Amino acid sequence: MNQTLLSSFGTPFERVELALDALREGRGVMVLDDEDRENEGDMIFPAETMTVEQMALTIRHGSGIVCLCITEDRRKQLDLPMMVQNNTSAYGTGFTVTIEAAEGVTTGVSAADRVTTVRAAIADGAKPSDLNRPGHVFPLRAQAGGVLTRGGHTEATIDLMTLAGFKPAGVLCELTNDNGTMARAPECIAFAGQHNMAVVTIEDLVAYRLAHERKVS
């Protein structure tokens, strides 16, 4: 990742701390992965606090595939089957079947409806009957161990939410350019600046976790 582009956001450790502060303040974070991986930036928000306005921003500027990152325990609690039994996608992204809140939504497409679906899925006592399938929110099952196991946006989202003190659940969507192409690091960083988002890389998060968990052990 081009460190010159990221230098205005601090050192790798500072970027993680600023990202955690942003999440606690109810703001979004732009998470970048490696240039030799997907080379994309994902907007992420805590599932607990994401607003309708933030969802609308995500839908307007993102790929349209609004994903809810969850743990395996939550997937089992909601009885969500994986989308396919044999995952042959390039990076093994853990899609489950799509979901919609069973109550409180109309078509499920609007920003408000998608927030309602997210809240229904992460509620403490959520049960399978609280959700209809299919729907317009795409759950992603994170790998246990987070970014130390798999360097994906899904795992980064769960790790960041956990470190920030939230439930291990977050919403992500890939940033796209106005012409429909995928936004790369320069566009992602510019967008983050325009929308008061922190910027962090998965590489930053790996280093942060390794350092902090080494201290604990």
UniProtKB/Swiss-Prot annotation:
Pfam families reported in the protein's UniProt record: DHBP_synthase
Coiled coil feature spans: none
Catalysed reaction equations from the record: D-ribulose 5-phosphate = (2S)-2-hydroxy-3-oxobutyl phosphate + formate + H(+)
Cofactor binding mode and count: Binds 2 divalent metal cations per subunit. Magnesium or manganese.
Assigned EC number: 4.1.99.12
GO terms under cellular component: cytosol
Essential for catalytic activity, annotated site positions: 136, 174
Keywords: Lyase, Magnesium, Manganese, Metal-binding, Riboflavin biosynthesis
GO biological process, one term: riboflavin biosynthetic process
Record: residues binding Mg(2+) 2: 38, 153
Family as reported in the entry's similarity comment: Belongs to the DHBP synthase family.
Function: Catalyzes the conversion of D-ribulose 5-phosphate to formate and 3,4-dihydroxy-2-butanone 4-phosphate.
Record's protein name: 3,4-dihydroxy-2-butanone 4-phosphate synthase
Gene name per UniProt: ribB
